[in-house]
């Protein structure tokens, strides 16, 4: 059997929107190798121009990785809070933040560098509301690798729009891996800046995905195309203008983008 045929037999189902295609396509992908099959043709993912695979509202969970929660534990138990939050702590990444893999993030003049958070996004295929953890993932299309960018800051207790809602600060991977083909119990990741590995690790969730979805859906409806970011590790390397960033999430694939300086007066 040809090597290419063997690779395709290892492939999994995913959903994507290559540029010039009007709809989300169901594709065969091999995330670890960066291979994709479109119209029967095997291509390298890096050679395809990708559009956004999801276009709904993006919500992010704070304090949902063990490393981040541990880092902020002293502040959570200090006045005026006195105890860790009992409910999910959310932020919103509005449409202006969305950028497909391969794009360029233009930093404003007041931002010297951007912190590169890596996470998994749960993408919904139908409305999900008031569900329990046992059925929470039934409404998912699948999962996508995400670069969740933010301006470095130390305070999680104020609205994070200025630090997290800037243009291009949510870089989505090329495809959504079908939920039946990915088990997001652990986040295993690597981040490179200018081709040099900046960090790698393994991260566990405070609330596992099903529990996190159920906790959020207890008070709001998550709609088709919406994305719930499950949390970022505390360690987030910094990228500056004129640098190239790549990250990988095991089982989901690779996200790439460039960092530039937004021109004065733009």
Language model regions located:
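N-terminal non-catalytic cap/leader segment that marks the start of a structured domain
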Residues: 1-88, 180, 196, 244-248, ...
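Catalytic-pocket segment enriched in acidic/His residues
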Residues: 30-53, 68, 152-266
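Glycine-rich nucleotide phosphate-binding loop and flanking beta-alpha elements
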Residues: 65-67, 98, 130, 235-236
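A short secondary-structure junction signal
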Residues: 70-72, 102-104, 110, 130-138, ...
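Short Gly/aromatic-enriched secondary-structure transition segments
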Residues: 74-80, 133-144
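Residues embedded in well-ordered beta-strands
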Residues: 119-123, 144, 190
């Amino acid at each position: 059997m040809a090597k290419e045929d063997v690779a395709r037999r290892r492939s999994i189902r995913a959903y994507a929107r290559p540029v010039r295609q009007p709809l989300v396509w169901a594709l065969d992908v091999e995330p670890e190798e960066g291979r994709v099959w479109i119209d029967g043709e095997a291509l390298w993912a890096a050679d395809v121009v990708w559009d956004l695979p999801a276009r709904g509202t993006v919500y992010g969970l704070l304090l949902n990785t063990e490393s981040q929660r541990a880092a902020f534990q002293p502040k959570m138990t200090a006045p005026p809070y006195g105890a860790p939050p009992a409910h999910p702590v959310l932020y919103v990444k509005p449409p202006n933040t969305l950028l497909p893999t391969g794009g360029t993030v233009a930093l404003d003049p007041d931002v010297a560098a951007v912190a590169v958070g890596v996470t998994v996004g749960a993408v919904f295929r139908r409305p999900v509301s008031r569900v329990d953890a046992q059925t929470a993932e039934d409404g998912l299309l699948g999962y996508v690798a995400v670069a969740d960018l933010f301006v470095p800051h130390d305070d999680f207790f104020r609205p994070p729009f200025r630090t997290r809602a800037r243009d291009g600060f949510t870089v989505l991977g090329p495809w959504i891996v079908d939920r039946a083909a990915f088990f997001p119990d652990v986040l295993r990741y690597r981040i490179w800046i200018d081709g040099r590995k900046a960090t790698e690790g393994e991260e566990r969730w405070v609330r596992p995905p099903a529990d996190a979805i159920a906790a959020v859906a207890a008070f709001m409806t998550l709609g088709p195309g919406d994305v719930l970011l499950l949390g970022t590790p505390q360690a987030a390397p910094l990228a500056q203008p004129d640098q190239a960033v790549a990250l990988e999430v095991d089982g989901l694939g690779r996200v790439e983008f460039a960092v530039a300086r937004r021109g004065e007066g733009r």
